[in-house]
């Protein structure tokens, strides 16, 4: 295992900058926010630790990238920033997300509520769910894993056409595996930062995807018609578990972070670290490091205290209700399904420690 440690001065410069204007901006932050963010360069901090690499196949080793500090983020002329008329994140589900309509509806509300807390201060809205056939995307059966896959680039074109006027971005989510081009095996997600759209699949986050008993394999490899989407009818969907929900929330917020202009983090253990495989993605924390937190706060303008409180409320709320963020049709059940948040409990304890620092 390799540990990537930066010097105190390197981390301090990455967070605060040496640009007098940006230093002045930092000094105007709430005292508690400065106290929390300063944990970035405290060697003994138990809130923010170094990045650990476990194998040569990990992202940083296999995909060398230039690091992005706060000043580089702030000065990037191409990054997207929400405007008064474009402060909504839209989520578009493609295909069913659960084994029943009710489970599917609850799952999308859980994910929506999480995004609403994570990107605190922005509106998060749902577009009406659509079947795969509505996208007119290309699809195939993967030659190695024998599961169905839909073409990510085609979905991005579909989302771009559906993008509402007040949208900062539109993100599609699906339980069907994705591929970006014929020569690729798969991709977890793909985004167009210019167009403000992204598509992300949670198919490989089910506990059984890589097992011999995976039920999503198409038994007969036959040439499928490009216009016959009936193959997706009643296609296998993994069980919605706490781990799958955590992985879904982690991936979705990471990828939306890219749409804001946050590049892969190479400073500290952080949600914005790249991941090359599921084991590495599971190691990546749910939280942003102080450098990436400052970037997101700069883009949205939230109170860090209120954002963390909103995340704790999302974990604590047994109800899945997300007022104002559900499609107009109603559920047929008499109550909400319990939200499986067991996997988030450790992170809740971490947030409470951060709130203690913020509110000293």
Curated annotation (Swiss-Prot):
Its EC number is 3.4.-.-. Keywords: Hydrolase, Metal-binding, Metalloprotease, Protease, Zinc. Zn(2+) 2 binds at residues 265, 270, 289, 292. Zn(2+) 1 binds at residues 254, 258, 264. Its cofactor is Zn(2+). One of its GO terms (biological process) is proteolysis. Pfam families: Peptidase_M54 (PF07998). InterPro entries: Archaemetzincin, MetalloPept_cat_dom_sf, Pept_M54_archaemetzincn. GO terms for molecular function: metal ion binding; metallopeptidase activity. It comes from the Eukaryota. Binds 2 Zn(2+) ions per subunit. One is catalytic, whereas the other seems to have a structural role. The active site is at 255 (proton acceptor). Belongs to the peptidase M54 family. Probable zinc metalloprotease. This is Archaemetzincin-2. The gene is AMZ2.
